[in-house]
Each structure stands twice: as C-alpha cells, then as structure tokens.
Curated annotation (Swiss-Prot):
PANTHER family: RIBOSOMAL PROTEIN L30. Belongs to the eukaryotic ribosomal protein eL30 family. It comes from Methanococcus maripaludis (strain C5 / ATCC BAA-1333). It holds the Pfam family Ribosomal_L7Ae. This is Large ribosomal subunit protein eL30. Keywords: Ribonucleoprotein, Ribosomal protein. One of its GO terms (molecular function) is RNA binding. GO terms for biological process: translation.
Length: 106
C-alpha cells in the first residue's frame, strides 16, 4: 500500500475546503464533534496540548478519525487558502476530495 505524500494530503485538504463543507478552528470543530457531526478531524502539529487532548477525547467518544498533519497551524491555514492560522479543521463533507482516505490515525 502506497503511503500518501504530504503534497497529496495538502491538495486533498484544499479541494475539501473549496468543494466540500469544512469547519475551521478548534472551538467550532470540538462543538461539531460533540454533536456527532464530521467525518475527519485534521490537527496541526503545533496545536496546543490541552486543545489536542480535548479533540482526541471527543473524537474517541464520537468515533471520528483524527489525522495529525505535520504542518504548523500557519502552514495549515495557508493550505486552506486562509490568511490566518488554522490549528484544527473538521471535514463535514469532503466534496470532490479524497481526504477521507488518509489513514494516519493516532
């Protein structure tokens, strides 16, 4: 099985943001996860430890997969096409993206 490169993942994130339904930000992601919404959470590598623990706790309860991206929050924001840092994003609908195929679950 071929492991996806970071460029493939970055492109999949951007396509999901452009064509699908994605929630940006840790507070909104956690809120939606608590309501059982979302198909995949992507967390930046430098996300705050306490926030990351909350995300992992609620995703475990809701059985939502989590992918820890190797990019910083500033880089993840740029990947999403935003001029601000993004520590976490929740994919509600992937659109034309293959983002749900990432399998680096922690």
């Amino acid at each position: 099985m071929r492991r996806r490169s970071s460029m493939d993942i970055n492109r999949a994130i951007r396509v999901a943001v452009d064509t699908g339904n994605v929630v940006l930000g840790t507070k909104q992601a956690i809120k939606n996860i608590k309501h059982g919404e979302g198909q995949l959470v992507i967390v930046a590598d430098n996300c705050a430890k306490d926030v990351k623990e909350d995300i992992f706790y609620y995703t475990k309860l809701s059985e939502t997969p989590v992918y820890t991206h190797q990019a910083t929050s500033i880089e993840l924001g740029a990947i999403c096409g935003k001029p601000f840092p993004v520590s976490a994003l929740l994919v509600l609908e992937p659109g034309n993206s293959a983002i749900l195929n990432v399998n680096n679950e922690e």
